[in-house]
């Protein structure tokens, strides 16, 4: 099958190359799926997409997928089933996928998901040096039916625009009046040259001049009103576009965040700004610039049709400039946004890990990495700016040449007494009101190109379904027993992290899960709060499958306190009350901080509960952060608490006091701990090794068994 250029798909984020390659093959057979959907089907992780993931996704969409390890002899076959996907180590540095669209004796033709490369050819020598040999061949099954997923174009923003129609109308009216005043000023110049000066009409000149001055004052008032309304419009559009993105981000499942770098998510805010800029510019161009072009075009035609026809000759040149620069701007905008996302991720990562960087004395090493990424971003941004500057220079040259031709031809008409000098000067003055709006419309190309790329990137987030899409009624429970039946879980299509877990936890039981690092302890408890869905098996609470619960209700019933408690910017009181009921009393707050053994620490601070904290709470010790987070969890209405290494930063004495307090509570508490002193005090201990429950019992029972737990305890 011949690969068509229209089927090319570029990757949006760093780890999208596998899904983008799959998308190209699917398009060749009439199926269109967003990269967001393909990431879900292929089990893409933060490390990228595996060949197995692409195989599973293809099979799920009605294809037979063969994964083979081939060599150079593949291209010597008479019938090679193009296009196919090849796994490569690009530039001998990082794993990547190409779509192979054809080959000849010396070259291999590829479609590279990298938007800076797109469709090109490589010498066979270069390709074979990169190719790992792994190749994926897709062919439709007899029952295959093409499917097309709906994605939002820039037209989807029309409802947002129409909501602001009153503001837009006022901006257009103000701009229209301002332009009319400027046109009147041009005719004043014509009358002055052709009538008032030759005929010495001093009185008329004075009256007209004063009138024009007053008109210009009104014009500036309208200019201010227009600028004010533009700011209002910009802010309202920002609320609609940026806040809706943030709202959607908060509603996405944990799997979305675990498979993307932070910078890839935050860089979409600047993408949204590009869309806002394009929307605002498009509104003004559609409603104002087009109107002014038509109006001034009519006036210029009435002024002198020969000169006006000369002006119209420049428009095809502008159109040619747009067509030439369109693919260039698309590619360069993609690259600028992608390098910006990588840079943002690194900066956020390094600021969050600054303590570790300083502890390892690796400031220079991390700086050099950011320096390299920043240089890459600047290089791409500079290339884009150069292209924009070249386009601007071409447009300006066309405009200047046009002005010279107008004056040249117009002067000839004046010499032949076909028009007056005043008419020529007025025509030249009015010309800017015709060409400037055309220039504004042409300038939309760059903004709309950037906005289209930005919209594609936003779509990849918007197309990830919210975890709250299904409206579920709150369920009433007669008891709070937890039961896990044959639970297995794996990230993407990698190895199983959990395998056939069977576990029952009674209401008010105090249970500790132990095991070496990487055994699956944290993953198991995250399934209990629906952060991730089990690959197989069921989990019930009160006899009801967790999938039937509204997630907000479930997380109010089961509170998970992660290994790294997060303290938010605000006061200690703000942090304590996050997630608590609005009716929480002072007595309940005091009770919670006492149970967490943090009351004395807080009350010794100068501002007590009103002490302001930054997001990293650098003024607090690790143990204080953990205890504030624990008090916050205790203030939640949860019947079940999951404490993932929640006391790991505490001294043994404080930890023992807190454990004693927690064991006395009328709640189910699940501890995850490396310190076996926590396990000793709990009712039951579950030992996990390589994703399986291998032992269960009390501390004394497990020691008596002399198994894995006993080894951990004695060692």
UniProtKB/Swiss-Prot annotation:
Family (UniProt): Belongs to the ABC transporter superfamily. HlyB family.
A GO cellular component annotation in the UniProt record: plasma membrane
Domain spans labelled ABC transmembrane type-1: 168-450
Predominant subcellular localization, coarse grouping: membrane
Organism the protein comes from: Lactococcus lactis subsp. lactis (strain IL1403)
The EC number(s) this enzyme carries: 3.4.22.-, 7.-.-.-
Descriptive protein name: Lactococcin transport/processing ATP-binding protein LcnC-like
Molecular-function GO terms, alphabetical: ABC-type bacteriocin transporter activity; ATP binding; ATP hydrolysis activity; ATPase-coupled lipid transmembrane transporter activity; cysteine-type peptidase activity
């Amino acid at each position: 099958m011949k690969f068509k250029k229209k089927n090319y798909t570029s990757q949006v984020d760093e780890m999208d190359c596998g899904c983008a390659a799959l998308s190209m093959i699917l398009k060749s057979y009439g199926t269109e799926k967003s990269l967001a959907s393909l990431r879900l089907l292929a089990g893409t992780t933060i490390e990228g997409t595996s060949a197995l993931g692409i195989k599973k996704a293809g099979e799920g969409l009605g294809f037979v997928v063969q994964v083979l390890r081939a060599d150079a002899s593949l291209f010597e076959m008479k019938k090679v089933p193009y296009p196919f996907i090849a796994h490569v180590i690009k530039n001998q540095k990082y794993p990547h996928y190409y779509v192979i669209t054809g080959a000849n004796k010396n070259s291999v033709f590829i479609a590279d998901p990298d938007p800076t490369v797109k469709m090109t050819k490589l010498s066979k020598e270069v390709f074979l040096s990169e190719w790992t040999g792994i190749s994926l061949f897709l062919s439709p099954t007899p029952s295959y039916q093409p499917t097309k997923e709906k994605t939002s174009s820039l037209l989807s923003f029309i409802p947002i625009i129409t909501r602001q129609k009153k503001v837009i109308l006022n901006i257009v009216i103000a701009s229209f009046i301002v332009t009319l005043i400027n046109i009147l000023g041009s005719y004043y110049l014509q009358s002055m040259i052709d009538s008032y000066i030759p005929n010495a009409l001093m009185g008329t000149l004075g009256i007209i001049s004063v009138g024009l001055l007053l008109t210009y004052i009104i014009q500036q008032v309208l200019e201010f009103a227009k600028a004010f309304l533009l700011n209002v419009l910009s802010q309202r559009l920002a609320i609609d576009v940026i806040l809706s993105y943030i709202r959607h981000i908060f509603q996405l499942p944990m799997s979305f965040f675990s498979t993307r770098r932070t910078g890839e998510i935050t860089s979409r805010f600047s993408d949204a700004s590009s869309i806002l800029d394009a929307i605002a510019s498009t509104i003004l161009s559609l409603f104002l610039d087009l109107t002014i072009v038509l109006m001034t075009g009519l006036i210029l035609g009435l002024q002198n049709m020969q000169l006006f026809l000369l002006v119209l000759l420049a428009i095809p040149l502008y159109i040619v400039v747009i067509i030439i620069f369109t693919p260039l701007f698309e590619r360069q905008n993609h690259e600028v946004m992608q390098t910006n996302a990588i840079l943002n991720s690194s900066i956020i990562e390094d600021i969050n890990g600054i303590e570790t960087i300083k502890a390892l004395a690796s400031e220079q090493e991390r700086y050099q990495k950011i320096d390299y990424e920043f240089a890459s971003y600047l290089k791409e941004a500079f290339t884009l700016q150069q292209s924009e500057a070249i386009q601007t220079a071409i447009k300006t040259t066309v405009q200047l040449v046009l002005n010279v031709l107008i004056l040249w031809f117009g002067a000839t008409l004046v010499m032949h007494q076909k028009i007056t000098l005043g008419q020529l000067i007025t025509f030249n003055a009015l010309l800017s009101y015709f060409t400037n709006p055309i220039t504004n419309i042409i300038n939309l190309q760059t903004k709309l190109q950037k906005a289209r790329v930005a919209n594609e990137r936003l779509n990849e987030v918007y197309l990830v379904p919210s975890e709250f899409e299904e409206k579920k009624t709150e369920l009433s429970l007669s008891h709070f027993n937890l039961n896990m039946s044959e639970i297995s879980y794996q990230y993407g299509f990698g190895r199983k992290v959990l395998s056939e877990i069977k576990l029952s936890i009674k209401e008010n039981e105090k249970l500790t899960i132990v095991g070496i690092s990487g055994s699956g302890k944290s993953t198991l408890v995250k399934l209990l709060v629906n952060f991730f869905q089990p690959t197989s098996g069921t989990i019930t609470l009160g006899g009801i499958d967790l999938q039937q619960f509204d997630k907000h209700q479930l997380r109010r019933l089961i509170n998970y306190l992660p290994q790294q408690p997060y303290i938010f910017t605000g006061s200690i009181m703000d942090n304590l009350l996050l997630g608590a009921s609005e009716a929480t009393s002072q007595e309940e707050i005091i009770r919670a901080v006492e149970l967490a053994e943090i009351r004395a620490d807080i009350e010794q601070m100068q501002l007590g509960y009103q002490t302001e904290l930054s997001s990293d709470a650098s003024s607090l010790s690790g143990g204080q952060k953990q205890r504030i987070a624990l008090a916050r969890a205790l203030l939640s209405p949860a019947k079940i608490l999951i404490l993932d290494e929640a006391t790991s930063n505490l001294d043994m004495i404080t930890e023992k006091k807190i454990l004693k307090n927690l064991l006395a509570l009328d709640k189910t508490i699940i501890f995850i701990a490396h310190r076996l002193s926590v396990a000793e005090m709990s009712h039951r201990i579950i030992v996990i090794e390589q994703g399986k429950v291998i032992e269960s019992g009390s501390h004394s029972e497990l020691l008596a068994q002399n198994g894995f737990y006993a080894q951990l305890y004695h060692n």
